[in-house]
Amino acid sequence: MASSVATLVKSLDKINAADFESDEAARVNAIAAAQKMIHRLQSGVERGIELTHQRSTVFPIIDVFEDLGLWEAWASQGHEISLEGLAQLSNTPLALNLLRRLCRLLTAADIFEEKSEDCYTPTELSLYMGDKTKGSQVSQGSAPGWVGSYTNLPIFLKETAYQEPLDPKKSAYSKTAGKSFWEELSQDPLQQENFGRFMSSWAKFKVPWPAFYDTESLVRGAEPGMPILVDIGGNDGTDVERFLAKHPGVAAGSLILQDRPAALKLAKVDQKIELMPHDFFTPQPVIGSRAYFFHAVLHDWDDAHALDILRNTVPAMRKGYSKLLILDIAIPRTGASLIQAAMDISMMSLLSSLERPITTWEILLKKAGLKIVKFWPDPRRYETLIEAELE
């Protein structure tokens, strides 16, 4: 029995992402299966320690490395480094044994690797966290305001008599920071830029939507001289660029990227794409586009505000011609993944908003005068593209 288990462990240890290079869905399923296997092997005490001690201590230390400038400085070198060398990269003098203890936790958590005693090797993750052009979701997601909102969520829910949080001005985040998430962004240009880069990085991680949605039908059915795609709240233009990459022959000006002026500053897009400042709480100025596209926008808002956004868009649509495309999480009736469920609680904590179940999407769109044509899940089963049109 012992030898067969040892053989199995060796086999499992050889599996890596390259084995699933051509099958993204299989890779995601393998991750889920591996995580479930770990949980089956752990005792209740072990899982409790993991949740209360192991995971909860990693994020603060990631933030310490961020404060010391170590992620960026190490990534710029990108090679093996000694403890002393790492200390020399710090923007602030620190005790060597303190750094050793911090590194011990981060290597045990596989954030970077321990090559030998007091010698470390970067990983894809640690290099990623040091690349400021990508706006790491790890460092952004472990920022004090975010972590504080998660920590304060139990207190916030108790103080609000365990009612579902749906007021964007009252959230666990606002309880922590003294202002809402959006208010803080609007008052802090640096934080707004960091958040924009974070969203850009997050978007690039996701499966490109033209890879699983029939964008060819949009181009084929488009009228000459009319807009084909309006990307509303599209940040740096990752999604509209992906559309253009698949359909490079579309006419200049037929693709439009809309967002707040501060967000559009991050957009470095092809000259065929028109940049247009727009507040999606005001009427959509582009009339009769083939498609209007929202990616990770509506999950930021409760139903009342989301309905307001939709009702400002619907009048611009043409019946029988225009499509409304929403790329967001659509939580299944059963069997939600951990990332889907965690994102829902994250939206609750930060914004008093939500990730919507499929049935909630159906009700919301119907109230806006829309009917769902089809749900298009991405291969990772994280997000779903909801195709809708006027009733």
From Swiss-Prot:
Swiss-Prot/TrEMBL GO biological process terms: methylation; secondary metabolite biosynthetic process
**Active site (catalytic residues):** H299
Note the superkingdom of the native organism: Eukaryota
Task: Give the PROSITE patterns listed for this entry.
Answer: SAM_OMT_II (PS51683)
Task: Provide the E.C. number(s) assigned to this enzyme.
Answer: 2.1.1.-
Looking up PANTHER family in the UniProt record yields: O-METHYLTRANSFERASE AF390-400 (PTHR43712:SF8), PUTATIVE (AFU_ORTHOLOGUE AFUA_4G14580)-RELATED (PTHR43712)
* Family (UniProt): Belongs to the class I-like SAM-binding methyltransferase superfamily. Cation-independent O-methyltransferase family. COMT subfamily.
**Name of this protein:** O-methyltransferase ATR12
